[in-house]
Amino acid sequence: MSERFSFDLHASDGKARTGVIHTPRGGVRTPAFMPVGTAATVKAMMPESVRATGADILLGNTYHLMLRPTAERIDRLGGLHRFMNWDRPILTDSGGFQVMSLAGLRKLTEKGVTFKSHIDGSKHELTPERSMEIQRLLGSDIVMCFDECPALPADRDRIAESMRLSMRWAERSREAFGDRPGHALFGIMQGGLEQDLREESAQALRSVGFDGYAVGGLAVGEGQAAMFDCLDYAPGFLPEDKPRYLMGVGKPDDIVGAVKRGIDMMDCVLPSRSGRTGQVFTRHGVLNIKNARHMDDPRPLDEACTCPACRNYSRAYLHHVFRSQEIISSMLLTWHNLHYFQEIMQGMREAIAGGTFEAWEAAFHAGRAQGDIEPL
């Protein structure tokens, strides 16, 4: 393990890259998918189960944790790693995205954002300085600077104004973060779908200097084609020798397309949220376990999968426990989905290292186009 934060790039194939992010709590193999532990837990999963899926790092949510149980309480109890029993790296978001999503419950100024809690209506203020303090109290390994993320579509003037505010907040975040060996601060590029604004944002962030860089403001309603158009150029504005993180993505084909365009890290609630609602990701696309076609099917969700749900249980059983609203349904389907997402990441890492990413991508899309296996 490294005592400092660093990033080693091991191989590339086209724009796709593979390497390792080194932290005092262990390495993160890239490209990496980060399961989301919103309130200090990946819903329906034990920490050791999350690790067993192949995850090297989790994401925690500053907004939710600052409200309940509070960052100060987590700090008194030994920090987020001890609190949730996860001894690997943790990345925390800044809270900005969730606060900006509150719409009528928040007020935006140059200083920061004041908002009302969705839990009890209490009033709070989140600024770049307060966000850095909260993430320090949590003990995050990777800290995200505070930013504003406008929903798309939005007009150019609104996007430009928002991006420049985020860049001023990035400078304040950098200053408030200070020098913390072993911990990293990532800047967040904004600019919507405007190439020149993305470049301006990247230049502003590079002039400040960060340990890694995120592409923010995507997967917020613009659609996959527009997102990929932006990713065709945006990662190229960022330093080659630093990790690149696409926030809030996503679906399996979004993940593969992002890695193809030079992204190293991603996060999304999709695999865990979908598991709780009966949506299952497999090599042959998405299936809905509540459908009656699975009622008498003795086969696993995916015959090539080695997760506990596929090794030990039939579609018929998983259909039954889902329809019966048994808690084990959420546990098994979430485990399967997270395992599948990590298998995608491992497949891409191996393909990039071997110079066969294009062939791997073609096989990935062919499998999904094939569709789920026919019912018995």
From Swiss-Prot:
It comes from the Bacteria. The active site is at D93 (proton acceptor), D267 (nucleophile). This is Queuine tRNA-ribosyltransferase. NCBIfam families: Q_tRNA_tgt, tgt_general. GO terms for cellular component: cytosol. Pathway: tRNA modification; tRNA-queuosine biosynthesis. It comes from Ruegeria pomeroyi (strain ATCC 700808 / DSM 15171 / DSS-3). Belongs to the queuine tRNA-ribosyltransferase family. Its cofactor is Zn(2+). The gene is tgt. Keywords: Glycosyltransferase, Metal-binding, Queuosine biosynthesis, Transferase, tRNA processing, Zinc. Homodimer. Within each dimer, one monomer is responsible for RNA recognition and catalysis, while the other monomer binds to the replacement base PreQ1. Binds 1 zinc ion per subunit. It catalyses: 7-aminomethyl-7-carbaguanine + guanosine(34) in tRNA = 7-aminomethyl-7-carbaguanosine(34) in tRNA + guanine. Residues 248-254 are annotated as: RNA binding. Substrate binds at D93, S94, G95, G96, F97, D147, Q190, G217. PANTHER family: QUEUINE TRNA-RIBOSYLTRANSFERASE. Its EC number is 2.4.2.29. One of its GO terms (molecular function) is metal ion binding. Zn(2+) binds at C305, C307, C310, H336. InterPro entries: ArchSynthase1/Queuine_TRR, TGT, TGT-like_sf, tRNA_ribo_trans-like. Catalyzes the base-exchange of a guanine (G) residue with the queuine precursor 7-aminomethyl-7-deazaguanine (PreQ1) at position 34 (anticodon wobble position) in tRNAs with GU(N) anticodons (tRNA-Asp, -Asn, -His and -Tyr). Catalysis occurs through a double-displacement mechanism. The nucleophile active site attacks the C1' of nucleotide 34 to detach the guanine base from the RNA, forming a covalent enzyme-RNA intermediate. The proton acceptor active site deprotonates the incoming PreQ1, allowing a nucleophilic attack on the C1' of the ribose to form the product. GO terms for biological process: queuosine biosynthetic process; tRNA wobble guanine modification; tRNA-guanine transglycosylation. HAMAP family: Q_tRNA_Tgt.
